[in-house]
Amino acid sequence: MWKLRKEGLQRYHTIWGLLFLGWFVSYIDRVATGPIITYMIENEVSFFADVANPHAIGGLIGSLFFAGFMLMQFPGGYLGDRFGYRAIIILSIFWAGIATLLTGIVGGLIAFILFRVLLGLGEGVFYSNDRSYIAYHSPPKKVGLGMGIALTGVSLGLTAGTLGVPYLITLAEPFMNHNAWRFPFFVTGGITLIVAFILLKYLKPKATPGVALDSSSPGIKAQFGKGFLYMTLYSAVFLVIVMGIYFVSVKLGLSSIAIAIILTALCPLLILYLYITKKSEIKPLLANKNLFLLYLFFIPIMWHLWFYGFWSVSIVKDFGGGALMAAALVASFNGLAGLIGFPLGGKISDLVSDRPNGRRNVLAVLTGVLTILIFVFAAYVMMGHNNPVVMSIMLFVSGLFFFALQPVAHALASDLTPEKSKGSMFGMLNLVAEIGAVLSPVVSGVVRDSTGSWGMPLMLDGALMAAGLVLVLAVSSQKVRQTTLSPAKAGR
């Protein structure tokens, strides 16, 4: 890639590539739920047979996954700061592979939800440690690029999941019949475990000649035993909370949206608990106005990501996109755009990093264009147009801007945070952001069931992104002077 041939392959390039693999399998595992549920709804199989409100229930399953995912965001970053980013990253991928395999083995709605929540709990610790590990081991001028390149795994995972899962179901139908929905979980879970072993072997920092590594630094140390113990304890508590809310809500006859709102309320309650118990560490992350605005900005970002990530195949199919595989092909163009958008956004972000509000201004432009493109796509399909080529182009272009803005925002948040707190900050950012992911699948599904069309959910998506633009414009970025140097930084 950029200047790679000139400088040769560096250790941080290897780290970017390995974390790309981590993102790839993480997103295949989580995005698989949407196409599988779409298949189950259409064919009325398993626990979706004779259900009156299938999209609402399917969306609720997605929201329960993201509730677990959301709750582990800050603990994941906190554990990374304590036991090492690398240890938590690798534990996350192993956990995801096992949870995915078990989802395919079990039967029944409750067991399905249980292992989707467990998947969310395991994958919830990945994000903050991945971002922090890249920031620690990359040269300052290449942090945005590194974050963007690693995140292309998101795009490839989204595309592979959107296209590959329907294909795997079709492949399995002749020998598994209505249990064909299980087959993708076996395949993706196995691939995830293979990647976990690769990360265990190769995701290691490299000593720089003349630079003494700080073995106590979270970017260097890797305490797997303690990391797994505390990760298990946090997950056990949150699993009981999430499943408890689900069982009590169902017994009380609450709607899917009501359950999602209750799950969302766990976010401020967890922040309050953390503030009371770890005030000295949490207060700076909440008192920084610019960081807080970025936390809120990521709510519509996650809403958009999982509105499309969960329901895109169903959206395209409902608006005349053909059979399941044909609709999946059109929908995949949105995720495919990230292969260009993520590294391009990261590179542009680095180019303007030294300018006053440089990253902020780029982020505002990308968000503004994306907002317009969301409304254009909504208007096109709501007027009855369904040309698959046109829809594919629209989804690809909007995806280009959507994925490009994310490494810009991540690098901006990193600029605003001291080195020792990056893991906790990214954990806090994604904790708040996952409010959007928790609400998006179920609210969108309920609105779809009540209106009979995906038109209103699309318009709601655009309105939320417009609100995100307002938040970005209120940010005034100022870099934090770092007091410690990572090996990548010390050598330059």
Could you say what each language-model-derived stretch is?
Residues 150, 154-204, 217-263:
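Helix-loop-helix hairpin linking two adjacent transmembrane segments in secondary transporters
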